[in-house]
Amino acid sequence: MSLNPRDVVIVDFGRTPMGRSKGGMHRNTRAEDMSAHLISKLLERNNKVDPAEVEDVIWGCVNQTLEQGWNIARMASLLTQIPHTSAAQTVSRLCGSSMSALHTAAQAIMTNNGDVFIIGGVEHMGHVSMMHGVDPNPHMSLHAAKASGMMGLTAEMLGKMHGITREQQDAFGLRSHQLAHKATLEGKFKDEIIPMQGYDENGFLKVFDYDETIRPDTTLESLAALKPAFNPKGGTVTAGTSSQITDGASCMIVMSAQRAQDLGIQPMAVIRSMAVAGVDPAIMGYGPVPATQKALKRAGLSIADIDFFELNEAFAAQALPVLKDLKVLDKMNEKVNLHGGAIALGHPFGCSGARISGTLLNVMKQNGGTFGVSTMCIGLGQGIATVFERV
């Protein structure tokens, strides 16, 4: 494949093991320490990359307060081998934050404003809860549906509009755990998980190289027994078909194709296009549809050209309508989230965009795909998507 000098390539990807937010492996690890460990280990793994060449560390994080405040990107960078002369910024696009970090780095490279970037994101939802310090504007209900900030209810709405049944959602949730467990047993996550020290359920320090969120004993019967989590009267969305609340971080080394060639590095993939899109906040989960369609148009590709998809599983009731309208629902078992998704692995907000993109690149590498799309919905009505081509 012939690459242009300013093409944007992904050199490597790593992530932490995903930890439960309640008493999980990361309960005694701060968000910036988790981030710094990941960045340091990924740079050690790629010793052709001089940390002094890093133009900017661009880190996604949603709830930027407490240990995640005061520009956590810089806080984490200062704890690594990256010199003080490199810059750092923290970005938030809610659920799409670290994919936005990737897009920001890509746009800088394309416009000759840097060659080497560290991107990724973190969310320690055990230490900084989802709603900590949040004060929504009371006048917002004059402009958007009152329940637009309640993601579970927006998923209920989207599922109802598209005729998604409770049984379909339970089957999707089961699939996520089964595929994530299978991927773990087969070593499919080995290249992406950077081992970290943490604490087990008995309080003993140990090294984790696996996700503690996956429930291999999940069954349709156990899922069917769960009560609706958001709408007690007639709701279909449960805890078992929603993304888990977890702690985690993800990281990528991104650079220009020219710099990768100069350093003798074989990239994982090149970015072919990027897009964001807005939708009605009341159906925020539908955002991946227009974002993906826009990204594919920019890449000159069609849905049929895409070998693999990673769609963030915010809710089964949200993911299924997206797959249906993207016309890949009938190809789901061959193309979509082959290593499970956020229902099994969790959705640490600032981490997830880079996480699903990196997992996609590993799926493509392991299965021989050429084109892949990572996409996700975003709270308050947005979608984001990236089209990759394997190099």
Swiss-Prot record:
Annotated keywords: Acyltransferase, Cytoplasm, Fatty acid metabolism, Lipid degradation, Lipid metabolism, Transferase
Main subcellular localisation: cytoplasm
Protein's GO biological process: fatty acid beta-oxidation; phenylacetate catabolic process
The keyword Secreted belongs to this UniProt entry's keyword annotation: no
Active site, UniProt feature: C95, H347, C377
One GO location term (cellular component): cytoplasm
SUPFAM superfamilies: Thiolase-like
Pathway it works in: Lipid metabolism; fatty acid beta-oxidation
GO molecular function: acetyl-CoA C-acyltransferase activity
Catalytic function, reaction form: an acyl-CoA + acetyl-CoA = a 3-oxoacyl-CoA + CoA
Entry superkingdom: Bacteria
TM ranges: none
InterPro entries per the UniProt record, alphabetical: FadA (IPR012805), Thiolase (IPR002155), Thiolase-like (IPR016039), Thiolase-like_sf_Thiolase (IPR050215), Thiolase_acyl_enz_int_AS (IPR020615), Thiolase_AS (IPR020610), Thiolase_C (IPR020617), Thiolase_CS (IPR020613)
Gene3D superfamilies: 3.40.47.10
Record Pfam families: Thiolase_C (PF02803), Thiolase_N (PF00108)
Keyword Metal-binding carried by entry: no
EC annotation from Swiss-Prot or TrEMBL: 2.3.1.16
Cellular localisation: Cytoplasm
Entry function: Catalyzes the final step of fatty acid oxidation in which acetyl-CoA is released and the CoA ester of a fatty acid two carbons shorter is formed.
Assembly behavior: Heterotetramer of two alpha chains (FadB) and two beta chains (FadA).
The family this protein is said to belong to: Belongs to the thiolase-like superfamily. Thiolase family.
Full protein name: 3-ketoacyl-CoA thiolase
Species, as recorded: Pseudomonas syringae pv. syringae (strain B728a)
Classification lineage: Bacteria, Pseudomonadati, Pseudomonadota, Gammaproteobacteria, Pseudomonadales
Gene name linked to the record: fadA
